[in-house]
């Protein structure tokens, strides 16, 4: 046994000598160098037992949570230094004195009571002595002790003190019903940032949700963090309530939810979030529409403050993911489209206006009255700017944005701007100031330009491509933005490609207008171009019956590509001569660069020029009354084509080449069938081109001599002109006789040799000079003109064209000299103007009339003056009527002021002068409005603005897009004298003043003077009421008045009209209507009634359409029906010989102007009037008296209408005229002397006569004859008959221009739809089954593939390519697809794949192979609405057909041969991807809905891997037989994966072609949220940081060894990302429990503890 140790030995160290005094010193130093702690420390048992450190049981003296005596200094636990009684508080001093008197202290000394009962058992001294006894095991012992202590703590925290998952008590504040006042008080408290949120967060008001919630936080300007908290509480509460309802509903009839089920929680919550997003968008939309409702500064300021807050609130919601982002962005764009006139009727009108130029005067008023609600659009544009960086991430949203912005740009530029200086703008509510509108247009234009450069694929927008393609081109060529030559070239290239893609796929959006919100799914974003076709064409096919077809039967519009020959002809028919057409006629040059005014020449310019020149001379356009159209075309070629080439050396070569091509075409014309050519028009064409210096006579003669046709002179006995076998020689001899030459030895020599008498140019010219000197020049100088002038110049009228051109130039110069030298002042009156106009018109020289003579007259120089407004008004009306010619009259250079602008300036100057001398009762306001529309409107008079600027009064379609407005050249002629200068600013200012001017009625003196002159008699008080004046003046106009008296009567009547309408708008019309109806009902002869009405029309008291409206009350009265028909025909057509008896030449001109105005703006009514007029109850229309009287005029009118309004005439013919009469009428229009066409067999006989110019006649003949003959037949007989008809046309194909772009594509377009589909099927079968393939690469004598007609003389591939292209662009109904058709497609594709990878296809047969592929793709486009279902049902396991299409796009030919075909196929495959996916989804839903057990249709087996699309190298076999389709079932999951993998297509272009040109300078905005704000801003991003993960906790410390944590330091459990949804992140406001936050503390292995800090 060991000896018991003493107390001192136990307390001492076992090796005491080792420490010595040094250890004691160190301990003493530590003891007395203790620093005071910074925080209150306490022993654990003090708080538990409430024991005071000095023995007091009361806890009242403790500080909260510190354990330190109140007033005492902080100190360490178990350390209680003695303090003298002087340092104690007063209440402790007495206790201390008592202790000092204690007897124990006196006997044993002072000591402190131990903390524990036995100090020795605390082991503190023992452990301390043991640990410090040796340094050998000190570290190991400390480490082991520390490990045990750490394990003890860890076990206590994880087992005893750990916060349990069940302890979480998070609840959103409950909703309680409050009174209105309390609810308002609560919202005020919420908006008060000084009031703690915890005080009001115990409950939230019930009933504040959706738009009410947004309005509440906006009205109260709640701080954003509190507004977000309130929003989250409301949203969370709504979601919880919806979840309960959903779960209760699903518990009744819910199998195990499938992955595709729409009722899964994920999809349910997406739907809930989208509903909330819709509410936010609706509130924004409503708020934006209120922007124009405030009328005070206070309301405006309140609105602006609220808008600022709303924008901030929306940004916070967006950044915090409290909105469905893609859905919200889609709704923003929807705002921009809301309110645009995109209904079928308006779209059709807008499309029609692009191909016709009937907008010289404003016709439709719906554009004028359109209110675009700019507040709504500005708010949407602001939001687009804010979220711009996110919008760029969604390609399908960018696509919708690009289309919407283009449409907005289009309509905003068409609506008048508001100006406080211009009251002529009527709709001020729908207008905004011009500077603001221009800024909006600039912003939209810059955004569109950036989108185009960012991703051109987003401009695949075929919906309204025909409407907005010109707008896009105008924006891209913005003059205000400097562009390099390379950038302009790239823009041109990419625009052409986008244009091709849109025009190729234009059928895709014909039957459905899907809302972008239907496509805005959260997973829709992808790579560039991947979401072009988010809306499946399967759904489009099924929704055709319910969706709006913008091209319905009543608003039909044939879509044509811009380079289509038929479109060029259509532009020529409507004289829609724009820059685009000019570009198609420019010769090709490699050095020409794309500039703002001209682009590179067209490769097919020769063909296009041939079309233009043939149009000028074809007999199918001979319905024109004069040769003015030819003059317009010639001036257009000069000004818009040749002058834009510039004066460079290369341009001179191009002009020479252009002249040479014209001569070649003339020779070709001379060699063609003369029955299709009007020779007189050919002579006019040649003479005008010569006069414009486009070609020279010398060049023509050199070419003629070089041709050798006049090499051998004919025998004198056998005159060549009598030899019908040589029409070429006769044609050129006729041309020579009509050339404007005198004393040309070459010409005279040829004519002398080849004609019996030659042609004496000089003699005829001198005779014409003598007549014109006597009948024109002398009569003007002597003021002896009369209305019989035309009868005096019959000789001149019958001269050859060339001599008339020479005489016109001579008489113009002589007339100017005679007037200048005349000693007396010559007054220009309407008689002189009308006779001069008629003379120049007869001589086919209106160009000289307007360019030289009218300008000379208006200048009032050289003894000539326009003294009265009557003459000026006639000149103005003539300029307006012939404005198409005037605006293209070429000057010395392209940059010089146009003739039209010069004439407009002179008209305004003359008006200002004449207005001071007489009362203006003419309709000059129409003249000013027309001028304002025609010229380019400059906001700043001193600067040339962007070409995108539109006129203040632009009508339906101002001329900026399709026909650029006539530009005002602000650089004045430096040669002009300073005092004579009339600048463009002066012009603009004067025009604005005239637009502002109002009608000034005559004063009483003027009225009395007119009444006295007309010898009108009134009672004493009759003159006080102008209603009494009207009948008497009308009575006076019925009598035979002189022209001067008629003018005075019209002046008095118009004055009364204005004064009566100022009191009652309809009163005057009612007076006139009653008077006219009484006149018609009377026994007065029709001729006299017509004479009276024509005078009213001439003086513009009433217009023709108003007059016909007056007839409506008696139109159906049998007693007046015949009389009204005759009267109306006389008014709209008339006979010139009859009218000359009672109307002057100037009045006849005015009447023709009004007739033209009526025909152009009331085309439908005019046609119905004609057809109803010639229709008889019994007998043929050709026996109708009106047809006998006006037959030639009716045929001329119908000939013009059938060209310009084919669809209208087709419908009206069938409904108004019998079939036999329709056939005979059309046959006569085709050829008056031709054998009538009575049946389809007759049509087959003349099939070779069809061409591009008579196409409309044959289209209607086909329609009428097929309806007549095929309707009674059975289906199989109809098919056989149509097949014979089709074969007859294919065997007799004849193309005047090119088979790749011809009439055949639209030949059958007006047939009934079932016949059109039948012909389509026949052509498809012929292509798919009759195309021959040559697989022998060594057989070079055969084409790789070919398709010819049965005769074998025509290659049908280019013909079919053109047909299917035009069919896909213009058809508007769904084409069905059969199983046999799909199999034929598959077989053809398999053969085609063998061809496209061979070397032969890239050599001699490139065009045929391209045509075959193009045809195949067009067929897919036509059938795409019904083809998807066949692909899924018959080829749904392997999708071999689609794989073969992918092989085609990866083939050698597509990759190396044709970029356009590759892009088209790429677009088509993207379309198929979405369609196939939707079809698979639809079939899967049907299967799931038919299942009876949980998990029906699901499988656990993984699908086999699908080959990557880009690695397929061999063609696959065709689709499975349809018999297997019935038993085919797909695994939905594997099918989705297969489709997704299969369509993993490479981008068509790897790099952005604009990467070197794209800049953000013009789209940057201070409001735009940066990428950092979008990705890192808000609480949602902080809580969902990628570094935060969830890992499984390991609570094993209780059962592990002491060194468990040490032995495995690198072992870490697996983790998962930590995610919280935005509405779940709520600020904690409760103070009642520990674990009541939105995040459960158990997720962090949290525990509770109460201990001193280390």
UniProtKB/Swiss-Prot annotation:
Record region (Disordered): 52-72, 1481-1530
Per UniProt, the keywords (alphabetical) are: Activator, Nucleus, Repressor, Transcription, Transcription regulation
Name a single GO biological process: regulation of transcription by RNA polymerase II
Annotated localization: Nucleus
> InterPro entries, alphabetically?
Mediator_Med12 (IPR019035)
Output one GO MF annotation: transcription coregulator activity
Q: Name one GO cellular component term.
A: mediator complex
Q: Polar residues: which segments have biased composition?
A: 1515-1530
Question: Pfam families recorded for this chain?
Answer: Med12 (PF09497)
Report quaternary structure and partners: Component of the SRB8-11 complex, which itself associates with the Mediator complex.
Which family is this sequence assigned to?
Belongs to the Mediator complex subunit 12 family.
| Name of this chain's protein | Mediator of RNA polymerase II transcription subunit 12
């Amino acid at each position: 046994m060991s000896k018991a140790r003493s107390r001192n030995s136990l307390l001492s160290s076992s090796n005491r000598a080792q420490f010595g005094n040094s250890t004691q010193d160190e301990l003493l130093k530590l003891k007395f160098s203790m620093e005071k702690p910074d925080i209150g420390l306490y022993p654990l048992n003090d708080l538990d037992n409430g024991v005071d450190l000095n023995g007091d049981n009361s806890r009242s003296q403790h500080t909260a949570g510190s354990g330190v005596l109140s007033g005492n200094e902080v100190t360490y636990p178990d350390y209680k230094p003695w303090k003298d009684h002087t340092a104690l508080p007063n209440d402790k001093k007495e206790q201390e004195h008592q202790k000092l008197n204690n007897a124990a202290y006196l006997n044993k000394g002072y000591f402190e009571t131990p903390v524990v009962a036995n100090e020795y058992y605390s082991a503190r001294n023992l452990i301390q002595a043991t640990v410090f006894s040796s340094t050998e095991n000190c570290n190991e012992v400390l480490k082991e002790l520390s490990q045990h202590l750490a394990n003890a703590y860890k076990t206590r925290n994880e087992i005893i003190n750990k916060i349990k998952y069940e302890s979480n008590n998070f609840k959103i504040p409950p909703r309680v019903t409050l009174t209105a006042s309390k609810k308002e008080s609560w919202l005020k408290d919420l908006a008060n940032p000084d009031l703690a949120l915890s005080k009001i967060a115990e409950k939230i008001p019930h009933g504040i949700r959706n738009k009410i919630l947004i309005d509440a936080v906006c009205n109260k300007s709640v701080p954003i963090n509190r507004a977000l908290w309130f929003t989250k509480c409301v949203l969370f509460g709504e979601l919880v309530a919806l979840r309960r309802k959903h779960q209760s509903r699903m518990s009744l009839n819910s199998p195990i939810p499938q992955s595709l089920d729409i009722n899964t929680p994920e999809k349910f919550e997406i739907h809930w979030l989208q509903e909330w997003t819709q509410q936010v968008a609706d509130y924004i939309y409503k708020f934006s529409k209120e922007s124009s409702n405030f009328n005070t500064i206070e309301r405006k300021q309140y609105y602006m403050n609220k808008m600022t807050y709303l924008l901030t609130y929306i940004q916070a919601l967006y950044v915090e993911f409290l909105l469905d982002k893609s859905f919200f962005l889609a709704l923003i764009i929807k705002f921009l489209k809301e309110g645009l006139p995109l209904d079928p009727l308006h779209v059709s009108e807008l499309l029609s206006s692009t191909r016709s130029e009937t907008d010289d005067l404003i016709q439709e008023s719906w554009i004028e009255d359109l209110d675009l609600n700019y507040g709504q659009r500005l708010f949407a544009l602001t939001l687009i700017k804010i979220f711009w960086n996110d919008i760029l991430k969604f390609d399908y949203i960018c696509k919708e944005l690009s289309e919407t912005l283009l449409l907005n740009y289009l309509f905003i530029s068409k609506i008048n701007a508001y100006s406080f200086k211009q009251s002529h703008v009527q709709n001020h509510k729908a207008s905004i100031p011009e500077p603001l509108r221009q800024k909006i247009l600039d912003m939209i234009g810059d955004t569109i330009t950036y989108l185009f450069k960012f991703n051109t694929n987003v401009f695949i927008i075929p919906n309204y491509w025909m409407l907005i393609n010109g707008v896009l081109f105008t924006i891209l060529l913005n003059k205000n933005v400097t562009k390099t030559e390379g950038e302009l070239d790239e823009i041109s290239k990419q625009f052409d490609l986008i244009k091709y893609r849109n025009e190729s796929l234009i059928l895709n959006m014909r039957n459905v207008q899907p809302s972008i919100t239907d496509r805005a799914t959260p997973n829709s974003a992808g790579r560039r171009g991947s979401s072009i076709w988010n809306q499946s064409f399967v759904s489009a096919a099924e929704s055709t019956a319910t969706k709006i077809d913008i091209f319905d039967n009543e608003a039909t519009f044939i879509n044509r590509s811009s380079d289509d020959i038929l479109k060029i002809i259509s532009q020529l028919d409507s004289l829609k001569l724009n820059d685009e057409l000019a570009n198609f006629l420019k010769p090709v040059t490699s050095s020409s660069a794309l500039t703002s005014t001209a682009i590179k020449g067209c490769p097919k310019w020769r063909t296009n020029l041939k079309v233009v020149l043939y149009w000028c001379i074809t007999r199918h356009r001979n319905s024109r009354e004069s040769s003015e159209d030819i003059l317009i075309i010639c001036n257009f070629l000069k000004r818009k084509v040749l002058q834009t080439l510039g004066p460079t050396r290369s341009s001179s070569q191009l002009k020479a080449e252009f002249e040479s091509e014209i001569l070649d075409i003339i020779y070709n014309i001379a060699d063609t069938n003369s029955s299709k050519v009007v020779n007189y028009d050919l002579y006019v064409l040649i003479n005008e081109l010569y006069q414009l210096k486009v070609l020279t006579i010398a060049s023509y003669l050199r070419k003629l001599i070089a041709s050798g046709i006049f090499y051998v002179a004919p025998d004198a006995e056998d005159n060549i002109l009598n030899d019908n076998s040589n029409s070429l020689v006769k044609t050129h001899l006729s041309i020579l006789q009509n050339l404007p030459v005198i004393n040309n030895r070459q010409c005279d020599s040829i004519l002398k040799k080849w004609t019996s008498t030659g042609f004496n140019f000089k003699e005829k010219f001198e005779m014409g000079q003598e007549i014109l000197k006597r009948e024109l020049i002398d009569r003007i100088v002597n003021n002896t003109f009369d209305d019989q002038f035309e009868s005096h110049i019959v000789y001149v009228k019958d001269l050859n064209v060339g001599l008339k051109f020479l005489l016109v130039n001579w008489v113009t110069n002589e007339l100017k000299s005679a007037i200048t030298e005349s000693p007396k002042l010559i007054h220009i009156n309407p008689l002189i103007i009308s006779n001069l106009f008629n003379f120049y018109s007869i001589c086919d020289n209106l160009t000289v009339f307007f360019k030289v003579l009218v300008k000379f007259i208006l200048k009032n120089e050289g003894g000539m003056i326009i003294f009265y407004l009557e003459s000026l008004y006639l000149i103005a009306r003539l300029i307006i009527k012939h404005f198409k010619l005037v605006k293209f009259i070429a000057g010395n250079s392209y940059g010089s002021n146009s003739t039209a602008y010069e004439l407009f300036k002179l008209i305004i100057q003359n008006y200002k002068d004449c207005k001071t001398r007489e009362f203006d009762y003419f309709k000059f306001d129409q003249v000013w409005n027309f001028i304002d529309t025609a010229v380019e409107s400059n906001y700043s008079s001193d600067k040339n603005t962007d070409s995108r600027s539109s006129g203040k009064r632009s009508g339906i379609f101002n001329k900026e897009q399709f026909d650029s407005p006539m530009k005002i050249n602000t650089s004045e002629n430096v040669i002009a004298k300073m005092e004579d200068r009339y600048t463009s600013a002066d012009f603009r200012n004067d025009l604005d003043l005239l637009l502002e001017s109002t009608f000034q009625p005559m004063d009483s003196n003027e009225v009395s003077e007119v009444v006295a002159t007309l010898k009108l008699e009134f009672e004493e008080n009759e003159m006080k009421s102008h209603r009494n004046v009207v009948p008497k003046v009308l009575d006076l106009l019925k009598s035979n008045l002189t022209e001067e008296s008629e003018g005075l009567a019209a002046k008095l009547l118009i004055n009364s009209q204005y004064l009566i309408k100022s009191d009652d708008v309809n009163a005057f019309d009612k007076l006139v209507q009653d008077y006219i109806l009484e006149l018609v009902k009377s026994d007065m002869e029709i001729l006299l009634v017509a004479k009276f009405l024509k005078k009213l029309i001439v003086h513009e008291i009433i217009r023709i359409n108003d007059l016909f409206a007056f007839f409506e009350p008696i139109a159906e009265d049998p007693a007046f029906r015949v009389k009204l028909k005759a009267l109306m025909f006389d008014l709209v057509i008339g006979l010139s010989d009859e009218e000359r008896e009672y109307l002057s030449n100037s009045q006849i001109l005015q009447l023709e102007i009004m007739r033209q105005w009526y025909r152009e703006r009331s085309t439908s009514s005019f046609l119905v009037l004609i057809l109803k007029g010639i229709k008889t109850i019994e007998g043929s229309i050709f026996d109708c008296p009106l047809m006998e009287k006006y037959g030639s005029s009716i045929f001329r009118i119908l000939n013009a209408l059938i060209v310009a309004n084919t669809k209208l005439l087709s419908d009206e013919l069938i409904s108004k005229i019998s079939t036999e009469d329709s056939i005979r009428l059309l046959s006569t229009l085709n050829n008056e002397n031709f054998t009538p066409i009575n049946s389809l067999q007759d049509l087959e006989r003349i099939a070779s006569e069809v061409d591009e110019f008579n196409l409309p006649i044959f289209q209607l003949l086909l329609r009428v004859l097929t309806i007549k003959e095929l309707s009674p037949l059975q289906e199989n007989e109809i098919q056989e008959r149509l097949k014979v008809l089709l074969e007859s046309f294919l065997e007799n194909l004849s193309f005047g221009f090119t088979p790749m772009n011809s009439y055949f594509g639209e030949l059958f377009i007006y047939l009934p739809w079932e016949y059109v589909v039948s012909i389509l099927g026949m052509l498809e079968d012929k292509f798919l089954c009759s195309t021959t393939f040559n697989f022998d690469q060594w057989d070079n004598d055969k084409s790789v593939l070919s398709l010819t007609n049965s005769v074998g003389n025509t290659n049908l591939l280019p013909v079919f390519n053109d047909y299917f292209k035009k069919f896909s662009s213009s058809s508007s109904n769904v084409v069905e697809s059969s199983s046999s058709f799909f199999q034929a497609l598959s077989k053809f594709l398999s053969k085609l794949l063998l061809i496209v990878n061979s070397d032969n296809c890239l050599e001699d047969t490139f065009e045929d192979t391209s045509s075959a592929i193009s045809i195949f793709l067009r067929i897919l486009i036509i059938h795409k609405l019904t083809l998807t279902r066949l692909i899924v049902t018959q080829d749904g396991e392997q999708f071999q057909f689609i794989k073969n299409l992918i092989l085609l796009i990866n083939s050698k030919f597509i990759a190396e041969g044709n970029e356009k075909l590759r892009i088209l196929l790429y677009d088509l495959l993207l379309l198929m991807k979405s369609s196939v996916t939707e079809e698979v989804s639809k079939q899967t839903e049907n299967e799931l809905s038919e299942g009876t057990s949980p998990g029906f249709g699901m499988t656990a087996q993984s699908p086999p891997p699908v080959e990557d699309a880009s690695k397929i190298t061999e063609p696959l076999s065709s689709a499975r037989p349809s018999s297997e389709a019935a038993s085919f079932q797909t695994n939905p999951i594997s099918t989705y994966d297969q489709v997704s993998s299969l369509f993993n297509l490479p981008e068509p272009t790897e790099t952005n072609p604009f990467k070197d040109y794209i800049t953000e300078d013009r789209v940057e905005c201070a409001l735009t949220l940066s990428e950092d704000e979008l990705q890192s801003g808000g609480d949602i991003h902080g809580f969902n940081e990628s570094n935060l993960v969830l890992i499984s906790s390991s609570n094993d410390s209780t059962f592990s060894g002491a060194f468990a944590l040490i032995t495995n330091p690198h072992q870490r459990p697996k983790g998962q990302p930590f995610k919280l949804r935005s509405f779940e992140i709520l600020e904690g406001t409760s103070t009642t429990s520990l674990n009541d936050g939105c995040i459960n503390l158990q997720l962090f292995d949290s525990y509770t503890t109460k201990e001193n800090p280390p």
